[in-house]
Amino acid sequence: MPMTLGYWDIRGLAHAIRLLLEYTDSSYEEKKYTMGDAPDYDRSQWLNEKFKLGLDFPNLPYLIDGTHKITQSNAILRYIARKHNLCGETEEEKIRVDILENQAMDVSNQLARVCYSPDFEKLKPEYLEGLPTMMQHFSQFLGKRPWFVGDKITFVDFLAYDVLDLHRIFEPKCLDAFPNLKDFISHFEGLEKISAYMKSSRFLPKPLYTRVAVWGNK
């Protein structure tokens, strides 16, 4: 039986998960929920099912794989990654996985806070000011490695791709000073399964966020 991935009909927190499902050639189907328009942003499609799915912590996204019912986007990523040995092998690799997993989520959340804020126009210049340093840290962490953990791809490369791509959309020039990050993105998008997915009708590059967001909601 295919796994079921449940999420809003947006890119959001499901982007890295969808990419990983495709890369691993996993059998899955999507349950997409639609949020209503302003001013109410009706969530009844999701709320009507929220407590009926047997989830311990009902939330979106969720993944149901037989008796396994998982929420929290990084827990979902790790679950898929463990099936395919994509969590790092040595202690050093696992440390790098853990660091980047959390760093990518922090940075992604920082951008989301700005994009969802009613004060978006005030917050954007300050965020852009700190962006070069943020990208520099990613660049230094990657170094000359082909993937963020080393020679082999791991699930955190999917998270890193997502967060770097989000920032590239937010500020198209933000990676210009970091050729290794641009190479990483090209390398990732050039993977056979990823490239095929991005050309398919299943691919959902936008909207980046829900309709509640000030930026990235279309």
Swiss-Prot record:
The keyword Cell membrane does not apply. Its main location: cytoplasm. Gene3D superfamilies: 1.20.1050.10, Glutaredoxin. It is an enzyme of class 2 (transferase). GO terms for biological process: glutathione derivative biosynthetic process; glutathione metabolic process; hepoxilin biosynthetic process; prostaglandin metabolic process. The modification Phosphothreonine is found at residue 34. It comes from the Eukaryota. Its EC number is 2.5.1.18. It holds the Pfam family GST_N. Residues 90-208 form the GST C-terminal domain. Substrate binds at residue 116. GO terms for molecular function: glutathione transferase activity; identical protein binding. GO terms for cellular component: cytoplasm; intercellular bridge. SUPFAM superfamilies: GST C-terminal domain-like (SSF47616), Thioredoxin-like (SSF52833). Glutathione binds at residues 7-8, 43-46, 50, 59-60, 72-73. Residues 2-88 form the GST N-terminal domain. The keyword Transmembrane does not apply. It is found in: Cytoplasm. It catalyses: RX + glutathione = an S-substituted glutathione + a halide anion + H(+); prostaglandin A2 + glutathione = prostaglandin A2-S-(R)-glutathione; prostaglandin J2 + glutathione = prostaglandin J2-S-(R)-glutathione; prostaglandin J2 + glutathione = prostaglandin J2-S-(S)-glutathione. Conjugation of reduced glutathione to a wide number of exogenous and endogenous hydrophobic electrophiles. Involved in the formation of glutathione conjugates of both prostaglandin A2 (PGA2) and prostaglandin J2 (PGJ2). Participates in the formation of novel hepoxilin regioisomers. Homodimer. This is Glutathione S-transferase Mu 1. It comes from Macaca fascicularis (Crab-eating macaque). The lineage of its organism: Eukaryota, Metazoa, Chordata, Craniata, Vertebrata.
